[in-house]
């Protein structure tokens, strides 16, 4: 301790401050900054008898938050849509910018349903109203049509201080919730919607997680089980991992265009009841990542099943505007529920979700959405309102955009023709790209792609040779991750492995969006087809 003594002015008393005369070795500095801790790492007692934490090998105080001490549920969370493939894609983009030579000139991110990032232009009316709400001085600009100004003025009038910079009510701005209710009534053929049952949210994801928080409870065999489709959107598995709920998988029927089979629901439920308490059934319609659109009969069967088995029904309907295939139509679970009569409409508990991020608008960055709850216990509804109040309110610009989506221009109004033209152009283009994706992928030996009936994705099944499977396993990778990483490194095409969404054992898939511009999508599909053939030749 001679170095220590020689480096100090004064003595170490229990409450004395330490003054340095000269720079000490780092280990000693750390020791001095962590009073009364042993240089050997042995815990020492403070004057009050409390034991301090050990020092780490590098002489610094041990961290409170480590992988061992953190919430273990967080470590179980996985989100493939922004996982290792996407991280590598970002690295490749930077390498290209630095002039590193690659077999491609750009990275095409076909991994996520972000329409504007893929080049889709905003719908004029949506942005005009948003612009005036953000900067009300634009009311004086004669470039903006009168219906745009009227819409913006109505929204601003409902905001605190007539500014979207003010907090809103936690459930969302009342006039916007009223407009959402009217939209639902129009969509569902006049079935009433109560604005008090509507909760605006930060995209649909926020309200889905909020609802799951309310539903999850119990321990051991009484722990809440949540039934989710496989393949599924990874938000669900991630949220269930974070909440330490039990994930109950039911498999969609790939041989029947990813249809939902009631017998499979019964199998999954019976199996789950052996080890948990299944209380929730989640449906994604149109499907993500699978792109199927459920028939009305299927929805009726699901409602009967949920009622018979006393399950809370969650209907993720964010792709309700994205239906392309002939003979397919979107039917909301609420509409079908009420048309089935009081036996179901007065008893079945339902939460349904919608978003500004998908559809024809694709406004992901605004983070707007809503949830409608049906037949919720009033006491629980009070708890739901309390829970959303903790986060103060959803982003007000997102609420504004949602209002414009659910309350668009009407025939005869100045903006109507342009609005309808732009909306239909986007949906027609998506329908053509859905057809194109199925057609080109099915030309490749070893790739099978079901029809993309709706949503924004294709989820083709790929054959992976046994040699590649063994190599992937040796590297600790899922075979489709191995395939997708090779695809990225050799072509610059970024897609998501099917293993990130769940799939039947022994099958391999990937998810890709249909959002790139048509010419780029054609090129992407042809390159993907060629790569798969090369991959098959190399590993067969």
Curated annotation (Swiss-Prot):
Keywords: Aminotransferase, Pyridoxal phosphate, Transferase. InterPro entries: ALAT1/2-like, Aminotransferase_I/II_large, PyrdxlP-dep_Trfase, PyrdxlP-dep_Trfase_major, PyrdxlP-dep_Trfase_small. It comes from the Eukaryota. One of its GO terms (biological process) is L-alanine metabolic process. Pathway: Amino-acid degradation; L-alanine degradation via transaminase pathway; pyruvate from L-alanine: step 1/1. It catalyses: L-alanine + 2-oxoglutarate = pyruvate + L-glutamate. The keyword Hydrolase does not apply. The keyword Transferase applies. One of its GO terms (molecular function) is pyridoxal phosphate binding. The modification N6-(pyridoxal phosphate)lysine is found at residue 358. Homodimer. PANTHER family: ALANINE AMINOTRANSFERASE, ALANINE AMINOTRANSFERASE 1. Belongs to the class-I pyridoxal-phosphate-dependent aminotransferase family. Alanine aminotransferase subfamily. Catalyzes the reversible transamination between alanine and 2-oxoglutarate to form pyruvate and glutamate. This is Alanine aminotransferase 2. It comes from Xenopus laevis. The gene is gpt2.
